[in-house]
């Protein structure tokens, strides 16, 4: 009687298993990954070089699972709105992945393509060089923060009974918790676009 067949393993299966672990626990490890797929740890290295490659595969997966519409770079404000929303929505579907993504360089061509679209839109607006890099860094921070905000508890600020009157007045008008994140994102997106417009005019 022959040996039982080894479980099939692929890069796609590894990526899916790693994403499931991150969604559930906030991280992944090779022992947990091997156990989930039902293979030995050593067999994983036949398909990926290590943790960094898996992280880039995860980045590729979440950015490409719902592709954004092509943008007209010349209409830079509309283009930025599409791109920033797509970036935020990608991480909003997997908010626990966001902290892991800031730990290494971005190399995936499809993800780099999103940043190329950002750079082209900013260039069309009139920005150059260092200002484009600074604008992209600002957008990056905002989009990742907005995605993490969607994973926040329903009650983010719970001030003590005494004091803090200004915050309490603001919170009384903040609306249902489920709407807070979306409203904050739309507000922040308007602020970023207005700020970029003002920067160009200065």
Regions found by a protein language model. Give the residues of each.
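Regular secondary-structure segments
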Residues: 15, 19-23, 63, 88, ...
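Residues in the recognition helix of alpha-helical DNA-binding motifs
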Residues: 47-48, 135
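Hydrophobic alpha-helical connector segments
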Residues: 67-110, 139
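C-terminal peripheral helix-coil segments that are non-catalytic and often amphipathic
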Residues: 155-202
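Append "Primarily bacterial transcriptional regulators
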Residues: 33-36, 44
